[in-house]
Curated annotation (Swiss-Prot):
Main location: endoplasmic reticulum
Region of interest called Disordered, as start-end residue ranges on this chain: 157-180
Protein name, entry field: Uncharacterized membrane protein C3B8.06
GO cellular component: endoplasmic reticulum; endoplasmic reticulum membrane
Positions bearing Phosphoserine: S147, S161, S162
Intracellular or extracellular location(s): Endoplasmic reticulum membrane
Pfam families: DUF2427, Ytp1
InterPro entries xref list: DUF2427, YTP1_C
Source organism per UniProt: Schizosaccharomyces pombe (strain 972 / ATCC 24843)
Membrane-spanning ranges: 33-53, 59-79, 97-117, 216-236, 249-269, 297-317, 332-352, 412-432, 449-469, 483-503
Membrane-protein topology: Multi-pass membrane protein
Keywords, in A-Z order: Endoplasmic reticulum, Membrane, Phosphoprotein, Transmembrane, Transmembrane helix
Amino acid sequence: MDGMHMNSTGDNPIEIDFENYANHMNKFLMAHIICMIIAYVFILPAGIVLAMAKSKAHIPVQIVYVILTLIGYIFAHISHHKASPENYYKGNIHRPVGRFFMWITFLIAIVGITTSILKKRMLKEYQPAAEAPGAMEDPEQALQRNSLDDGAPLLPREGNSSDEYLPPQSSRRDVSSEKPSIPSISFINIRSWRTIPKKWCVLQVLRYFHRILGHLWLYVGFFESCTGIVLLAGIFKGQHIFNGLAHWIKGAIFLWYGILSFGEYLGAFSEYGWAWNVVPKQLSEKRFAKYVPTKEMVESFLLFAYGVSNVWLEHLGNTDGKWNHHDLQHASLAFMLWWAGLCGILVESKVVHRLLNATLSATLGQRRSEDSEHSENGLPSYNVFPALTVFFTGIMMSAHDQTNHVSTVIHVLWGRLLAAAAIARICTYIMLYLKPPSSPWPTRPPTEIITSFCLICGGAMFMASSYDVVNKIRLNEMSPMLIMNISVAFTCIVMGLEVMFLILKGYASSR
């Protein structure tokens, strides 16, 4: 479908937008862009990793992020009123969605500050009147430590406020020699919730709400950045929006796939066994461990959801409503992702493992104690369906016929990058199958660097292969090589920032 509607006449609306889009660029808009880049690319990720490291510095960083976001929003508002009406992008969602996200940003900040204040107040209640030397405990460790023994209800201490709770006297610990610890309701028996003070429940709910929103805000910032680029460049108008959505959604998925893969290589999510490591025994024995999906299950589900949601998207961009061979190519690709993702989900499912073992279990007269080999030994999964799906996506899109040379070359380049990423991932599986990891520390197979690099670079070039973007490349007489160079540089910047943020997390955790 790319390039099918190319218009070489001088009144091409895309060409007019491209030549005049600089009219948008006043000093207030530039200030808005700079503020948002600093806030979303540097400050927000730093605040997230500091919060994950339980550092007290994450609150000041979060305040700086909110202030920068507010200043950037004000600059954007001024810029909009100074722009001439003919430069408005009618029907854009960047401004209304940005306004909504601004309020959510304030909500996140309020929740974070409230949680911090509430935690400090409750910690004071749990400090004995006369502290013994060396009795002080790190507040965050106190919050993390669970005073519930096997879900036993908490009982108030005699002679003290009813807000101070201790384990029942039947506990084997000598509670008289300890200061009361702060209960955690993360993974305890639900029946014991009624015996926990309501303020503890409120604190834990606020903490998890703040943590979840903080992680989601990375993707929100990326979404707003993409809509801002679309607004500034004047692309994806009218029926072209469907072609733009199809390419940018797909490209963004592969781009974030690569970012997460590189994070796993560096050691992120190692507590779940996602860093090509053995799941730590202390965590695998916890009650919640059996509910944590494998990395391959998450990847398969994302491919499945992506395939289901993108079957008809390219066809909707047709002005005549008729099916052509480009529509069939895109629909068949979506069906492949749909069913390949479903195969990956089924292969990774513990329920399916039990059913597949049912015949042997009946013959032996016993059931396996665990659902799968990798869960039994704490080893990573060797489900290759996600890698195969990415490989064939790259191979097929490399052969995706286009109506102009620039679009054809760009499709070939990012298709080969995705295929290379899949091959590198399969090499990772082969190496780990021949020599499985034996330590809870991240294995860091070198092939995962290639996988991550090719996914990020391929995803960026995927987004650049949409119809309107290719037209702008041609109108400005740029070559596919330049787009490749920009994508490679962008990939190196992203991976470098990711390393620095995880270094910051490790440094904060060590302190």
